[in-house]
Amino acid sequence: LPTGERVHRHPDTVIVVTTNSDYAGCREVNQSVISRMDLIYDINTPDLSTMVKRVMNVTGCTDEQETAKMAGVVRDIAERCRQTMISDGSCGMRELKAWVLSTMITKDPYESALSTIIASASADPDNRADLISTCLEKQYVR
């Protein structure tokens, strides 16, 4: 410390660092930090089956078929955002969870999608319209 005092690490200390470096406002992890890490794991998006199991477990939703359909839409939106360089939002596991929870309340996946996965994917009205027509309405017709 600047005072000259030393703080000793407990021998059982484990430090976990997580980051979403591709999000706006986040930076790449500093090289000096990386060089001090013993293990580094990049965690990719889980497959649809894993997404469905996790979301059902967290939300208490029991409709596996509907949750799988919703997970497919989320995957399609994320891919469409990558392809068209829509980068002002997010569409992944947290958004899927929000959509499932909202749908459990509203009983209307389409309406719930508008205020969860679509709203989270982009703030731009044109981008949202594109995601609705190319991804959401392939599975949920209004």
Positions of PLM-derived features:
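C-terminal regulatory/interaction module of P-loop NTP-utilizing enzymes
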Residues: L1-R142
